[in-house]
Amino acid sequence: MKEGIHPKYEVISATCSCGNEFETSSTLCKNIHLDVCSACHPFYTGKQKILDTGGRVDRFNKRFGALGSKK
C-alpha cells in the first residue's frame, strides 16, 4: 500500500441516546452520537414485538385460510 495517502485511525468515544458509551476506532477523529446501540436495540435486548397492524393477518386467514385445509 502507498504511504501517506490513508487517513489517521484514532480511538474515539461513541455515545448512544440511551446513555451507553463505548470506545471504538475511526478515521472520523471526533466523538460521535448514536441513535441506537446494542444495549438498547430491540433485536439485541430480546424485547422485540411483532405488531399486527389493523388485523391484516386475521383478515388474510379468514379469506384464504380455508383454501389450505382442503387438501
UniProtKB/Swiss-Prot annotation:
Instruction: List the InterPro entries.
Output: Ribosomal_bL28/bL31-like_sf, Ribosomal_bL31, Ribosomal_bL31_A, Ribosomal_bL31_sf
Cofactor notes: Binds 1 zinc ion per subunit.
Q: Which SUPFAM superfamilies match?
A: L28p-like (SSF143800)
Annotated binding of Zn(2+), by residue:
16, 18, 37, 40
An MF annotation (GO) of this entry: rRNA binding
The family this protein is said to belong to: Belongs to the bacterial ribosomal protein bL31 family. Type A subfamily.
The organism of origin for this protein: Pseudoalteromonas translucida (strain TAC 125)
Domain of life of the native organism: Bacteria
Identify this protein by name: Large ribosomal subunit protein bL31
Query: Per its UniProt record, what HAMAP family does this chain match?
Result: Ribosomal_bL31_1
